[in-house]
Amino acid sequence: MNGIMTTSSHSNFYNQDLVGAPSSSDHIPGPSSQDQPTNNNSPQHHHQHDQSQTTHQNHPLNQPIHHHPTQQNQSESQQSRQSHHLQQQQQQQQQQQQNQHNQQNLASSSTSYEMPSIYQQFTGSYQQTRVPKNFLLENANYYTLQPGFPLVQAADYYSTPTTTSANDYQNSTINSIISPSFQMGSVSTPDTQNSSIRSKQQQQHSYQQQQPQQLSQSQHQSQVPDIFYTQGGTIGGYVTTKQQQKEFSRKTSGDQTLVPQTNSKLQQQISETSYSQQQQQQQSPPTPQKQQQQQHYQHQTTQPYGGTGFMLYSQTGGPSSSPVAGNISIPTTIATTGQPNSQFQFTYGSPQQGSSSKTNQMYLYQRQQQQQQQHQQPQSQQMSQISQLSQQIPPQGSSKNISINSTPTKSRASSITTRSGRQSRSTSISSFIPQPDYPERVIRPKVATTRWDDENTNCYQVRARNILVSRREDTNYINGTKLLNVIGMTRGKRDGILKTEKIKNVVKVGSMNLKGVWIPFDRAYEIARNEGVDSLLYPLFVKNIKQYFLTKGHKLKSEDDEQEILEEGMTRQREEVRREGRSNGVGDFHNEEEEEIVGIQEDAGPNTAENDVPGDDEEEEDDDDDDDDDEEEGEQDDEEEEDGSSTSMSSSKNSESKLLETRDVIKSIVEEGDSTTGNVSEVKYVHEYLERSPQSTAIKEEDLYYGSSHNTPLTVHKTL
């Protein structure tokens, strides 16, 4: 015994000044009352009292004890010496266990994550310096009863266990009011985490003898396998950031299926506990509580972050700003994870560093219980549950071991889901937008509008035979000069018709499409209808052309499409003519063509002669300046027409000579017979050659644009 006085580390040392707090002598069993009054101050009985106190430590605390009145007169020096003596015994036991555990770790260490020997020695010395850390939980609930510590936990997460030990734990006062600072201090200390399985069980047995109030807590501790207590432990709950990063990267690395074979004892314990739990599940019939737990488990798997139960905050109305220690361990049942027959203990704080084998074994233990629960369900439910878990649950164990340190993974997963949700929304919206099928080439519309700035109006233009015929929007006047050009009239006839018009508007300044003599709508429609070009100029003569242009103008075909239609019609006519020529004979067909050519040549002469007469009449009759300008233009056009007639005569003679030359060849082909395929092909070739000749095309265009001032193709073949 030391003669030096030291401060007591007993918890009653802090409770002596409190009102209603029991003294330390109430819980210390003394010797018999006969020897105590006489031998109270002798040094021998000090030694006897120490022996009696050590022998009577197995006496339960909640058992009624009858003390002698003189027992309360014990001095405070005896209390301090006794408590110091107990403290030294506890420290010696802790040092022995620490040394044994260090030797075991050095002997059986095979992984790269175990703690070095220097760090373990530091833990032992650090525990010696932190003497007031080992509290005896006699008045542990005092701090929770004060108004400054309203730490009432959510009782919903502790109401579903079905085992007897869980019921004992449920009936205890710790379920309703939990002290986060002193709840599991003597059970989940770093010493017990550092010890092996057997030493931990022995130490739990000694704690049960000293404090039987912790019976339910020790039962809860004995059910938890050692895989949740990593080697090395934590120093008073303080973990460095590097160790946290290592643990976090180890959890998220994904190497959860590889379990080392070093810890054979732990694997045996896992198999034994799983086998005993399987037997209990087979013996006990399915109760409605289990069915509710299974439904709750499926709901939690479908919504892993839906509820706040994983964060273990108070939901019963208590303030959320209550102080919580950093190294507390909150016992939670597996009601949230759907495993009723086992209880786990998660740390509400920094993660514990340790070897990767124990974390992998923790995941293996959970997977074994998942497989047991799945085998009890029907096969169809098992397949559906596997599909749901594979689609919706992140890596195994992440939704079941959620602490504050797993919030980075939660936020990362939520950000991924929101990002994918935004992508899915964008694709779904774009899928409903109608995608117009654009044509392969841009089609020029048949009806177009142009701005006439000089007249301050708009004009609608319709293209026919490569000529634009315009119509004013304000007065509906139509350019008669362009209209007569589409009809194909000569210069003289056109000028004669336009001069006889009573209502007209002569335009000499502007673009080529807008120059000419403008006549009213009714007169222009009458001329077009009489000449048969009203359908060709559609929709120029629609009454409400503005509304038609806005509604149906874009649907009209362009000039190119119109030319394609005309070419198709011409090819059909050619095929019909070929069929008729084969049936009647090729010679007769060419004779008919020659007769047509001769008729055209005979008609060309008098037409050119007649074109000079209106020009002379106009010079004699009209005296206006406009008429004089028209006369000059008419004279120039007449000269061009004479040149055109001469070229047409020469071209017709050349074509006639060529046709006469090829007549003998065609007759020889016809005499040989049309039955052979080669002869038929030769006939077709000759016929197509004659049609492709420039003379025949010139004749057709002469027939089409006869007497017009715009029949420029007739002047192209002067070199022939």
UniProtKB/Swiss-Prot annotation:
Region described as Disordered: 1-111, 181-223, 245-336, 365-437, 569-662
Annotated Acidic residues bias: 613-644
The name this protein goes by in its record: Transcriptional regulator EFH1
Swiss-Prot/TrEMBL keywords: DNA-binding, Nucleus, Transcription, Transcription regulation, Virulence
Entries under PROSITE patterns matching the protein: HTH_APSES
Organism in which the protein naturally occurs: Candida albicans (strain SC5314 / ATCC MYA-2876)
Compositionally biased spans, kind Polar residues: 1-15, 22-35, 181-200, 254-266, 313-336, 400-413
Compartment(s): Nucleus
Cross-referenced SMART domains: KilA-N
Annotated S-S bridges: none
Single GO molecular function: sequence-specific DNA binding
UniProt note: phenotype after gene disruption: Exhibits increased colonization of the murine intestinal tract, a model of commensal colonization.
Family: Belongs to the EFG1/PHD1/stuA family.
Annotated GO CC locations: nucleus
Record gene name: EFH1
Classification lineage: Eukaryota, Fungi, Dikarya, Ascomycota, Saccharomycotina
Functional note: Transcription factor that regulates filamentous growth through repression of EFG1. Regulates the level of colonizing fungi, favoring commensalism as opposed to candidiasis.
One Pfam family hit: KilA-N
